[in-house]
Amino acid sequence: MHLHEYQAKDLLTAYQLPIPPYHVATSVPEVEAAIQAEQWKAGVVKAQVHAGGRGKNGGVVIAHSPEDLLAAADKLLHMQFSSNQTAGLSLPVNKVLISPLVEIASEYYLAIVIDRKHRCPVIMLSKAGGVDIEEVAEKQPDQLLKMTLPSSGKIYGYQLRRIAKFMEWDQPIADQGNRIIRQLLQCFYEKDASLLEINPLVLTKDGSLVILDAKMTIDDNALYRHPELADCYDPSQENIRDVLAKQLGLSYIALDGTIGCLVNGAGLAMSTLDILKLYGGSAANFLDVGGSASEKQIQEAISLVLSDKSVRVLFIHIFGGIMDCAVVASGLVSAMQGQKETIPTVIRLEGTNVDKGKGMIINAGIPCEFVTSMSEGAELAVQLSR
């Protein structure tokens, strides 16, 4: 689950981390009230969206007067934000964060993230903060320090000394940096985060290290341990089909292909995506209905896939062990009968009640092509998608 910047800052504030004062507003009058309460004469207004690239795409506005602050807030609160990180979506800006300006001497990058290759957290730092870190890593890899962290959630003294040397911090600044890193690590572990990114971490002209921006992602699988974070979920920042899938209890991820997929089992679903790519096609989604889906869930799942206008072909790939092919067939018939238009449909059914399931589909007059293997189905689906 992604957090908004203000939500991440709320969490970090509880860990006594240095963050400039800020207010969150949903309307211009709320912004005006915050400005008057703080007596700010200048500041920054930031769109609260689940996307990077805000600074480059008009989502962050620096204002040098109260009037400019109000104008910036009014502009952002009516914005549909998009960038190269929104996957083609335009995200509504429902809230803005207002904060005073800070006199910056240097900007740094700091992140703690789960490295799936090494199966452990890593910490990454760079003296080139406030920019696209991907660009720095690609063009100037020597400007990025990356270290694996122990599973204990601590960081060793020699690692902190290496960080201070790499970042060229003198002892007073290194002492501040050490405390910030330790507190960030504590937050990362205690909140079951998969990402905690500070960009930028800044050194002010008076010699203080301050967190200006924060991005945080919580592991969905650990949310049951954090009921206090339930209200942080913002469905307005997600693809509507992702939101509906969560409500239906389905494992769905929108992709950018043209072949809609309905599969049972995550392993089979990933294999299906791979073989579609092998034959020159691409999936429009990952959808695992599991082994205990009901007829209603199958119906809703198919309707969900077909609601994506980029889908040209539907590929249903079921290997029924626990899953009953007759239940899948019944859900398919119900879903197709409710569609105004039909698209080419490729079906591979194997396992429990397969003959009964196929008979139900044939008797209902659902136009489709039955196949007997994964490769045959993938090849046909790719052909029909062209």
Curated annotation (Swiss-Prot):
GO process terms (BP): succinyl-CoA metabolic process; tricarboxylic acid cycle
Pathway: Carbohydrate metabolism; tricarboxylic acid cycle; succinate from succinyl-CoA (ligase route): step 1/1
A Pfam family reported for this protein in Swiss-Prot or TrEMBL: ATP-grasp_2
EC number(s) given by UniProt: 6.2.1.5
Residues binding Mg(2+): 199, 213
Cofactor info, note text: Binds 1 Mg(2+) ion per subunit.
PROSITE patterns linked: ATP_GRASP (PS50975), SUCCINYL_COA_LIG_3 (PS01217)
Domain spans labelled ATP-grasp: 9-244
Catalyzed reaction equations: succinate + ATP + CoA = succinyl-CoA + ADP + phosphate; GTP + succinate + CoA = succinyl-CoA + GDP + phosphate
InterPro entries: ATP-grasp, ATP-grasp_succ-CoA_synth-type, ATP_grasp_subdomain_1, Succ-CoA_synthase_bsu_CS, SUCC_ACL_C, Succ_CoA_ligase-like_bsu, Succinyl-CoA_synth-like
Keywords assigned by UniProt, alphabetized: ATP-binding, Ligase, Magnesium, Metal-binding, Nucleotide-binding, Tricarboxylic acid cycle
Binding-site positions, ATP: 46, 53-55, 102, 107
Residue numbers binding substrate: 264, 321-323
GO molecular function list: ATP binding; magnesium ion binding; succinate-CoA ligase (ADP-forming) activity; succinate-CoA ligase (GDP-forming) activity
One GO cellular component term: cytosol
Gene3D superfamilies attached to this UniProt entry: ATP-grasp fold, A domain (3.30.1490.20), ATP-grasp fold, B domain (3.30.470.20), Succinyl-CoA synthetase domains (3.40.50.261)
Cofactor(s) the protein requires to work: Mg(2+)
Assembly information from the UniProt record: Heterotetramer of two alpha and two beta subunits.
Database matches in NCBIfam families: PRK00696.1, sucCoAbeta
Task of the protein: Succinyl-CoA synthetase functions in the citric acid cycle (TCA), coupling the hydrolysis of succinyl-CoA to the synthesis of either ATP or GTP and thus represents the only step of substrate-level phosphorylation in the TCA. The beta subunit provides nucleotide specificity of the enzyme and binds the substrate succinate, while the binding sites for coenzyme A and phosphate are found in the alpha subunit.
Family as reported in the entry's similarity comment: Belongs to the succinate/malate CoA ligase beta subunit family.
HAMAP family per record: Succ_CoA_beta
PANTHER family: SUCCINATE--COA LIGASE [GDP-FORMING] SUBUNIT BETA, MITOCHONDRIAL, SUCCINYL-COA SYNTHETASE BETA CHAIN
Protein name as catalogued: Succinate--CoA ligase [ADP-forming] subunit beta
Organism whose genome encodes this protein: Chlamydia trachomatis serovar L2 (strain ATCC VR-902B / DSM 19102 / 434/Bu)
